[in-house]
């Protein structure tokens, strides 16, 4: 099972809480995190893109770095780990993204890929006059399909000519091209998003569900597998979980209860309000799950709370779900969390026993 880290490109990571660790994103912080992840043989690191936050007392996600430039820097200070940046496709022309990606491919020696997002938070784009109107909610995957076709053409052949609805390319060129096949990933959870991923993505991210229910995402993975099978493609699901771990179950649970008690109500209200703006998509979108009041304090990603052994056991359970290819992890404290994961949790995981063999070979 592949394991990646969803690095904290925005302040406070993924905990919307006054009692969680409070910090701003910096290159040095993310360098430390990704280098630790590489040391402990994580398979990949992903950074999101966020152009406006949720406010509140914690100013949640009001302080964000830019994804491609951050990953370019991280590419230069790592050697093995796969790196993914996120393209905000509404404000980043595909020909420019194709060239930036090819450049980072060169910096990383072929370890780079691109996560594409359509954009759901209207104020991110309205603030710069680039929101295309609310009809976009129903057309966003049509837009993304053209966008990715431009990327694939430029990376694959070095040129693109397209007379599309959203993009006009007249012998557009990119060179040098990537030395390795450029992976495109997506996080489609709605029917439209999964249909897109089934046709165009190399793998698809989805949310884990609940607290200490590691296989509850199985119906989502099954939907993705069905959609991919219909396209005769293999598109596995990579599942997003937060790990809150300690030496004992009781100590880990105490952390989780503390974070929930300090939930930033004002920031959560903003999230709920923004999730209601899209009245045209179905009820199965990512943002609908993020705003669910059940566990909005960490945007309702799956949460694994427990001792080193408990978390290791639950992570192994994820691998039993058909269609699951890996996990994308966040932590309450990333530096400490990855260190503890590498030293205490991963050695207990049956699905990561090959790591011990690799470490001996490196030594």
UniProtKB/Swiss-Prot annotation:
It catalyses: uracil + FMNH2 + NADH + O2 = (Z)-3-ureidoacrylate + FMN + NAD(+) + H2O + H(+); thymine + FMNH2 + NADH + O2 = (Z)-2-methylureidoacrylate + FMN + NAD(+) + H2O + H(+). Gene3D superfamilies: Luciferase-like domain. The lineage of its organism: Bacteria, Pseudomonadati, Pseudomonadota, Gammaproteobacteria, Enterobacterales. Keywords: Flavoprotein, FMN, Monooxygenase, NADP, Oxidoreductase. GO terms for molecular function: alkanesulfonate monooxygenase activity; uracil oxygenase activity. PANTHER family: ALKANESULFONATE MONOOXYGENASE, ALKANESULFONATE MONOOXYGENASE-RELATED. Belongs to the NtaA/SnaA/DszA monooxygenase family. RutA subfamily. The FMN-N(5)-oxide reacts spontaneously with NADH to produce FMN. Requires the flavin reductase RutF to regenerate FMN in vivo. Pfam families: Bac_luciferase (PF00296). This is Pyrimidine monooxygenase RutA. The keyword Hydrolase does not apply. It is an enzyme of class 1 (oxidoreductase). Its EC number is 1.14.99.46. GO terms for biological process: alkanesulfonate catabolic process; nitrogen utilization; uracil catabolic process. FMN binds at residues 49-50, 115, 124, 140-141, 190.
């Amino acid at each position: 099972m592949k394991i990646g880290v969803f690095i904290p490109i925005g302040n406070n990571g993924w905990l919307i809480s006054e009692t969680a660790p409070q910090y701003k994103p910096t290159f040095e912080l993310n360098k430390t995190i990704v280098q630790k992840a590489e040391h402990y043989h994580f398979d990949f690191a992903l950074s999101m893109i966020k152009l406006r936050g949720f406010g509140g007392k914690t100013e949640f996600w009001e302080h964000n770095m830019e994804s491609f430039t951050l990953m370019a820097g991280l590419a230069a200070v790592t050697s093995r780990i796969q790196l993914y940046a996120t393209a905000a496709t509404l404000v980043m022309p595909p020909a420019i993204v194709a060239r930036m990606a090819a450049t980072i491919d060169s910096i990383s020696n072929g370890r780079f890929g691109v996560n594409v997002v359509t954009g759901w938070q209207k104020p991110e784009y309205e603030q710069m006059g680039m929101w295309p109107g609310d009809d976009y909610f129903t057309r966003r995957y049509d837009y993304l399909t053209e966008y990715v076709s431009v990327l694939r053409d430029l990376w694959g052949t070095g040129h693109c000519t397209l007379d599309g609805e959203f993009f006009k390319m007249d012998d557009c060129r990119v060179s040098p091209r990537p030395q390795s096949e450029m992976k495109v990933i997506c996080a489609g959870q709605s029917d439209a998003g999964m249909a897109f991923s089934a046709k165009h993505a190399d793998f698809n991210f989805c949310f884990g569900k609940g607290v200490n229910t590691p296989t509850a995402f199985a119906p989502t993975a099954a939907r993705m597998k069905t959609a991919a099978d219909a396209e005769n493609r293999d598109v596995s699901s990579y599942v997003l979980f937060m790990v809150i771990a300690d030496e004992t179950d009781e100590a880990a649970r105490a952390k989780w209860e503390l974070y929930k008690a300090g939930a930033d109500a004002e920031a959560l209200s903003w999230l709920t309000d923004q999730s209601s703006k899209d009245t045209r998509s179905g009820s199965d979108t990512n943002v609908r799950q993020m705003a669910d009041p059940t566990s909005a304090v960490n945007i309702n990603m799956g949460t694994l709370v427990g001792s080193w052994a408990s978390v290791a056991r639950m992570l192994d359970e994820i691998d039993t779900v058909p269609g699951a290819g890996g996990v994308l992890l966040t932590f309450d404290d990333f530096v400490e969390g990855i260190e503890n994961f590498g030293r205490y949790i991963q050695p207990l995981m049956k699905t990561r026993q090959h790591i011990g063999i690799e470490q001996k070979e490196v030594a």
